[in-house]
Amino acid sequence: MLDPNLLRNEPDAVAEKLARRGFKLDVDKLRALEERRKVLQVNTENLQAERNSRSKSIGQAKARGEDIEPLRLEVNKLGEELDAAKAELESLQAEIRDIALTIPNLPADDVPVGKDENDNVEVSRWGTPREFDFDVRDHVTLGEMHAGLDFAAAVKLTGSRFVVMKGQIARMHRALSQFMLDLHTEQHGYSENYVPYLVNHDTLYGTGQLPKFAGDLFHTRPLEEEADSSNYALIPTAEVPLTNLVRDEIIDEDALPIKMTAHTPCFRSEAGSYGRDTRGLIRMHQFDKVEMVQIVRPEESMDALEEMTGHAEKVLQLLGLPYRKIVLCTGDMGFGACKTYDLEVWIPAQNTYREISSCSNVWDFQARRMQARCRSKSDKKTRLVHTLNGSGLAVGRTLVAVMENYQQADGRIEVPEVLRPYMNGLEYIG
C-alpha cells in the first residue's frame, strides 16, 4: 500500500511512476475524493466542537435554575447530525482505502521501463548448456521411464495440474528441498520456520494478495451454513505467512535484519494460464517451494535484494545448473514489487531458460498494510520496515532441471554430487 500522504500531496508524480507500470491512476477522482474528505472532516470536527460546547451549556443553565429542555433537544439533534457526519466520513475513507488497496507499488528508478516479459533485461549468465549427443528426453518421459511421475493417478485423485511422485524421483524431490533449507540456514543466515498452509484474510491483505488477487487463490468454505464460518485460503507462497509474522509488531532496529526461510507446498489456481504448460511439472496447482524472506532497515533493502538473489543463485551453482539472471521491466513486475530479479534455469527439452526463482524488494508496501515497524534505540522513533521475498528455489522446477540436464543416453539420471548425501550416496536413478 502506498503512503496516503504521497497520494494526497503528490498525485501527479505518483501517476507518472505508475504509468511506467502500465497502471492508470485516476488523479481527478482521487483529488475529488480528497476534497470531499477535507470538507467532511471539517464539518465533523465543527459539529463535535459545537456539541461539546452545547453540552457544557446544559450544566451551566442547570446551575442557574433555567429550563434545560431546549438545550437538551439541541444537543440531541447535534448528536444525530454528528453521527451522520461521522458515518459519511467513514464511508468515504473506506472508499479511498479500497482504491488505495488496488494501486500497485511504485517502481524503483533503476527498473527498466517496458510493457511485458519481452522488455525484461538480461543481467548475466552462469554455466554453459550441455551439448547432448543423443535425443533429449523431457522430464515427463524420464519420470515415466522410472515410474516416478504419475499424472494419471493425480487426475484420478484430484484433477489436472497435479502429480503423484514415487520412488527415487520422490526421494530426489525431498532431497532438493532439504539441500536448499540446509544451505540457507547453515550458510546464508536464515532461520527455518514451519508455518500454516491455511491463512486468514487479514494475512492475505497484509502481503497484498487481497483484495486484488482473490481469484488466484484456493479458498475454503464450510460444507454447511451452520458449520464453522471461518474463511481461509491455501497459501500461494510461504512469503504470505512468513512476512506476516511481523504484522502489528515494533522491532528493535538492532534485531534487523530478520531472515526467515520455510519449505511449504504452494497452491495457485493459475487463473489466466489456460492452455499454457499443460505437460509436466512446470505449471501446477500444487507445488513445493523453499521461500526466503527478509525484514530489513529501509536504507538496506536494495543491498538485501542483491544478497537474497545471490542466495538463490548459489543453489543453482552448487547443483551445476546453467541459468541466467533477469531484471524485470516495470510492466512485468508483481503487484507489490519495486524491483525484481528472476533467475531462469536451462531446460534442455524446451531448449530455453524458464523461471525458477523470483526475488523482490517490496520497500514499505507490505509493511504499511501490516503496520510492521522498527524502533531506533537512539531517538525511540518508529518507522516502517522494508520487506523482501524470494524463491530459493521452486522445488518442482528444480527437479525438472536436474532430471533433464543430468539425463544419460540410456535414460538414467545422474544425481548431482551435492544431493548424494541426502540420497544415501545414490549416484544414478535407474
UniProtKB/Swiss-Prot annotation:
Instruction: Kindly state which keywords UniProt assigns to this record, in alphabetical order.
Output: Aminoacyl-tRNA synthetase, ATP-binding, Cytoplasm, Ligase, Nucleotide-binding, Protein biosynthesis
Q: Which Pfam families match?
A: Seryl_tRNA_N, tRNA-synt_2b
Q: Could you confirm whether the keyword Transcription regulation appears in this record?
A: no
Known catalysed reaction(s)? Answer: tRNA(Ser) + L-serine + ATP = L-seryl-tRNA(Ser) + AMP + diphosphate + H(+); tRNA(Sec) + L-serine + ATP = L-seryl-tRNA(Sec) + AMP + diphosphate + H(+)
- The answer to whether the entry has keyword Protein biosynthesis is yes
Annotated pathway, please? Answer: Aminoacyl-tRNA biosynthesis; selenocysteinyl-tRNA(Sec) biosynthesis; L-seryl-tRNA(Sec) from L-serine and tRNA(Sec): step 1/1
Give an example GO cellular component term for this record.
cytoplasm
Q: What is its main location?
A: cytoplasm
Which terms under GO biological process does the entry name? Answer: selenocysteine biosynthetic process; seryl-tRNA aminoacylation
Protein residues bound to L-serine: 237-239, 291, 391
Identify the residues that bind ATP. 268-270, 355-358
- Entry-linked PANTHER family: SERINE--TRNA LIGASE, SERYL-TRNA SYNTHETASE
Please give the HAMAP family that the UniProt record associates with this protein: Ser_tRNA_synth_type1
Function comment: Catalyzes the attachment of serine to tRNA(Ser). Is also able to aminoacylate tRNA(Sec) with serine, to form the misacylated tRNA L-seryl-tRNA(Sec), which will be further converted into selenocysteinyl-tRNA(Sec).
Q: Which family does it belong to?
A: Belongs to the class-II aminoacyl-tRNA synthetase family. Type-1 seryl-tRNA synthetase subfamily.
Notes on the domains: Consists of two distinct domains, a catalytic core and a N-terminal extension that is involved in tRNA binding.
Under what name is this protein listed? Serine--tRNA ligase
